[in-house]
């Protein structure tokens, strides 16, 4: 059974809550176990929590769940670009999948509501990567 850790952003919690629930349902459907969840203030705050989960022997992969909505400045782009870069770096550093389930940047609130399946897609990617990496080890 694949053991997942979830890192969930509290910012835009109404949306990340729906993303989290869909992700949990999909994990159960795939036969994966969500072993641990860590709530962080926002997507930019995820890397340290991800690193903490990746250090645990009982976590096979981490799923990120966040939602970054466009504002009047380029803040949303900076947040997502930096979070995505660090997330990829951590995956390579620890040799474990970290799936990007962050919706944004450059989207309106209505577009964000249409993208709540990003968490589900991230679970799918994480489980597939764990299984495929085990096949070649």
Curated annotation (Swiss-Prot):
Q: So what does this thing catalyse?
A: (2S)-2-hydroxy-3-oxobutyl phosphate + 5-amino-6-(D-ribitylamino)uracil = 6,7-dimethyl-8-(1-D-ribityl)lumazine + phosphate + 2 H2O + H(+)
Q: Which UniProt keywords apply?
A: Riboflavin biosynthesis, Transferase
The molecular function GO annotations come to:
6,7-dimethyl-8-ribityllumazine synthase activity
What GO biological process terms are annotated to this protein in UniProt?
Answer: riboflavin biosynthetic process
Q: Which InterPro entries match?
A: LS (IPR034964), LS/RS (IPR002180), LS/RS_sf (IPR036467)
Keyword Aminoacyl-tRNA synthetase attached: no
Q: What is this protein called?
A: 6,7-dimethyl-8-ribityllumazine synthase
Q: Which organism is it from?
A: Methanococcus maripaludis (strain C7 / ATCC BAA-1331)
């Amino acid at each position: 059974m694949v053991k997942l850790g979830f890192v969930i952003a509290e910012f835009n919690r109404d949306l990340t809550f729906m993303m989290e629930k869909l992700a949990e349902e999909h994990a159960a459907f795939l036969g994966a176990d969500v072993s641990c969840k860590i709530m962080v203030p926002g997507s930019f705050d995820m890397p340290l929590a991800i690193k903490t989960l990746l250090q645990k022997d009982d976590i096979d992969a981490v799923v990120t769940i966040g939602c970054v909505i466009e504002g009047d400045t380029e803040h949303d782009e900076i947040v997502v670009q930096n979070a995505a870069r660090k997330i990829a770096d951590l995956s390579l550093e620890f040799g474990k999948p970290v799936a990007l389930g962050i919706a944004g940047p450059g989207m309106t609130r209505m577009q964000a509501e249409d993208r709540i399946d990003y968490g589900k897609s991230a679970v799918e990617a994480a489980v597939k990567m764990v299984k495929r990496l085990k096949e070649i080890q």
